[in-house]
Amino acid sequence: VGVADGKLFFITTKGAQRGRLMTVELANAGTDNWVELVPEQEGVLSSASFAGDKMILKYQKDAADQVYVYDRSGKKLNEIKLPTFGTVGISSDKDNNEVYYSFTSFTYPSARYSYDMATGESKQIGSTEIKNFNFDDYVTEQVFYTSKDGTKVPMFITYKKGLERNGKNPVYLYGYGGFNVSLPPSFSPNRLVWLENGGIYAQANLRGGSEYGEEWHQGGIKQNKLNVFNDFIAAAEYMIDQKWTSPDYLTIEGGSNGGLLVGATVNLRPDLFKVAIPRVGVMDMMRYHKFTIGWNWASDYGTSADSKEMAEYLLSYSPVHNIKNDGTKYPAIMVTTADHDDRVVPAHSFKYAAALQAANTGNAPKLIRIDSKAGHGAGKPMSKVIDEYTDIYSFIFQNLGIDPTKK
């Protein structure tokens, strides 16, 4: 965090898997002299910063940010009220009593605020304008559903107000579930075309992420990886059971580790989905560690070289090795990759798409989209992003029977 009053202020997960704020005298900084300033809370402590003579602590609770003002002795003074479930970025320093922060959510394009430490009031000082879209017509709610082993899993659902739960609404279910990465609320312009065509956007906070600290992460890695797929399946079943949708209207999507998620989930429950979009996915779990940076993922996946037991576990869900070939009807699938992806090499998607097309999995289309002169995704020019999502939504709309010209 920083140094003040002759002390180092820092966050540690030692003895607190969701994090706690500590101090130690610079002159005597051994671990035996650490002093707990703010103990572990229900939320995950994701950041702390000085703001004048006070401190701003940001927690992630149930996958959404909460922000509090503390004094330097560890006493909570105030909560910075946010518009709804969202994600916050903090800018503050020791020499200024005014704090600046950004806020975004599923139906909130990024907005900037100033917060006065003296009055406890926020003032919006900037926003992102999106023309021809009324965000007030849409709402986000958070639900908690039960996974296969009884674990409660949070999920955000965004939809148009007044939507009827008749089991016929198109749902776009997104997940990741790995590498200690959380999925907080975020804004993406590409989702607007989905929402304005009557779609529901659902984002499940699966195990393997950091939403509830290291225990949540550990619950979705190595020989717990099936928990992630079961969490995703349970999210789909929840949306169906609660009459948000039905299998004929349900699309799933995920990228990278999320592409693995989609590929594995489709093999486990092909009956649950109408469309699947596995993007730049890790599809060969037996050999992933032999390509480029793949060896670095062993901390989450384990490798087939670790042990016979680990190899058998990986083989049990590896997407390319578990495609059914008995006439089981699979959803329409568009695999995406890029010819210069050196993170998840395109061979994963090539092998998976070839295996899909060779197998007897019904008549729904099984396509692969190969982007040229592109990589894993980061830094992609906007023109390529637009082209990719145009193809993705066209594929989804075609297979769900949605005509975007008729709203």
Residue ranges of model-derived segments:
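Active-site-proximal cap/loop segments of hydrolase catalytic domains
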Residues: 203-407
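Acidic helix/loop microenvironments that form the catalytic cleft of cell-wall polysaccharide enzymes
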Residues: 177-179, 257-258
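Peripheral, non-catalytic segments that deliver or gate enzyme domains
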Residues: 1-168, 179-197, 224, 237-241, ...
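A fold-wide structural signal in alpha/beta-hydrolase
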Residues: 171, 195-205, 367
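Conserved beta-strand elements of the Class I
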Residues: 9, 171-173, 334
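Active-site donor-binding loop signature of nucleotide-sugar glycosyltransferases
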Residues: 39, 82, 117, 127, ...
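The conserved beta1-alpha1 loop
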Residues: 175-177, 337
